[in-house]
């Protein structure tokens, strides 16, 4: 890879250290495309990934939208940054009805892109169930077992089946 970290070229993907890496460049490009229509960022990111990694690495990249280190993707796509709010406020905040509707629509579009790309689509627990949350620790809430968004869960299941059938 062309990864330079702390001033040193890293050799993570040469068979001795890692089999894959988390594809943050794709995540950021998909978010920017869905939120702001930035086609150029999407093109640049995907071309850059192909340029930096051989096909055998591209085929196993971990493609994702949410992680334990980021705001919940539904919250990001719902459009409420939570900026300027106290931890107590963030602990109890939920998206408004229209924000939730917008967030779900955007999340579906984004996940179709992730699932259609080279690499391995990954879903952070709860994203498929409509879990909301802001920065840590609010992105690490427990899975909403009795309060899942069944429409969203079914959507993720359908896309997974489509991906496997390719």
Give residue ranges: language-model regions.
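Active-site-proximal helices and loops of the catalytic beta/alpha 8
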Residues: 1-61, 113, 130-161
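A broad, low-specificity signal for short, low-complexity segments enriched in glycine/proline
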Residues: 21-28, 81-86, 103-106, 154
């Amino acid at each position: 890879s062309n990864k330079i970290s702390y001033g040193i070229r890293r050799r993570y993907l040469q068979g001795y250290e890692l089999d894959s890496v988390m594809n943050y460049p794709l995540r950021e490009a998909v978010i920017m495309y869905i939120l702001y229509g930035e086609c150029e960022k999407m093109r640049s990111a995907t071309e850059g990934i192909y340029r930096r990694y051989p096909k055998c690495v591209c085929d196993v990249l971990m493609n994702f939208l949410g992680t334990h280190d980021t705001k919940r993707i539904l919250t990001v796509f719902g459009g409420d940054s939570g900026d300027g709010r106290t931890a107590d406020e963030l602990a109890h905040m939920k998206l408004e009805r229209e924000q939730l509707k917008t967030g779900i629509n955007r999340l579906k579009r984004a996940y179709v892109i992730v699932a259609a790309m080279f690499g391995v689509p990954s879903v952070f627990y709860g994203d498929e169930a409509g879990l909301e949350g802001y920065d840590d620790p609010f992105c690490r809430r427990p899975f909403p077992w009795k309060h899942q968004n069944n429409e969203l869960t079914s959507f993720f299941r359908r896309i997974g089946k489509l991906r496997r059938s390719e």
